[in-house]
Every structure is written in structure tokens, then in C-alpha cells.
């Protein structure tokens, strides 16, 4: 068993039917899940740090810390079910979110990461929620899919729409027919040195 197979075996859920799809590389599928687990851990840890800011009477940082900890628990719930085996409804919630498209998860993670940063801008909220935001960005990129092959992009660029003539590619092609070229007749006059 190779190292990659061991890692994917650790990060795979039991009876998982490859919800992301076969078109995604294994390192992106499991890397996003690993990033989500690490992000959730640090969000909970730094959210707790923000909660302790009540000592300085900063209520907005207290609220931001609570929101950040809840966001960390939600991300941990969706990414690492093994941490919540004692709760029966966790599987139902995770399966429901897994059945949604990837852009739903991306939007959820990004939306959960923004309020703590706005309420209490500091290293703790920036790093903890920033990792969740990064996980949402990775899921968003996975939702966009991979880029088309070079042949497909060339074919799409050369298609004509509605009987239009294909685009001209020479240097003399202009937007307006019969347009006169720019001409410079000499050096620009000097300034009055003011």
C-alpha cells in the first residue's frame, strides 16, 4: 500500500461513494478535507482565545470568538465525522451537505469565516477564520472544475456564431472598417519650460 493510499484511506468516510466526483485529483479531494480539519481545529483554538478577550471588556471580540468556535465545530462536523461519533444525527447532516453541490459548501465556509474577522480584527480571528475561508476557496475552485484541454479551447475560440465571419488575426484588422491608421508627423513640440 502506497503512502497516498494510506492517506486517502485515513481521510475517506466509511461507505463513501466519492461525492466529489472522479474528475478531481485525489490530492485536491483529500487535501481540501485535511485543510478543513486543520482549519476547524485552529478556528476552535483561536475562537477560545478571542472568548478570553472578555477580560479586556471587548464584547465584539467575545461574540466573534463564539461565532468562530461555532464555525470551527460546523467545519469539523462536515469534514471529520469521526470526531462526533457519539451523536446520531451527525451522519444525516453530513450526508445532506455532501449531497449538495460543492459551491454550496464553499459558500457556507466563506460566509461563516467573514463575521469573526469583521467583528474582531486581529491575528487570532484572521488566522482561525482565514483558514476556514481558504477551505471555502478550495471547495469553490473544485466546484468550478478543471480547465478544458488546449484542443477544446482552440475549437471553442475558432467557432463562428450565427454565420459571422471568423475573426481576423492580421495586424491590419481593425474594429471599424476603413479606419485610418494613426500617424505621427514629427516630434512633439517642446514645452515652455514652466
Swiss-Prot record:
Annotated GO biological process: bulk synaptic vesicle endocytosis; cell competition in a multicellular organism; clathrin-dependent synaptic vesicle endocytosis; photoreceptor cell differentiation; positive regulation of neuron apoptotic process; positive regulation of presynaptic cytosolic calcium concentration; synaptic vesicle endocytosis
Known regulation of activity: Channel activity is inhibited by La(3+), which reduces Ca(2+) influx and thus inhibits it's function in promoting activity-dependent bulk endocytosis (ADBE) in response to high stimuli.
Site residues (Calcium ion selectivity), renumbered to this chain: 79
Membrane topology classification: Multi-pass membrane protein
GO cellular component, one term: cell projection
Localization in the cell: Cell membrane; Cytoplasmic vesicle, Secretory vesicle, Synaptic vesicle membrane; Presynaptic cell membrane; Endosome
Transmembrane segment boundaries: 35-55, 66-88, 107-127
Ranges in coiled-coil conformation: none
Similarity comment: Belongs to the calcium channel flower family.
Function: Transmembrane protein which mediates synaptic endocytosis, fitness-based cell culling, neuronal culling, morphogen gradient scaling, and calcium transport. Regulates synaptic endocytosis and hence couples exo- with endocytosis. Controls two major modes of synaptic vesicle (SV) endocytosis in the synaptic boutons of neuromuscular junctions (NMJs); Ca(2+) channel-independent Clathrin-mediated endocytosis (CME) in response to mild stimulation, and Ca(2+) channel-dependent activity-dependent bulk endocytosis (ADBE) in response to strong stimulation.
Name assigned to this protein: Calcium channel flower
Annotated source species: Drosophila sechellia (Fruit fly)
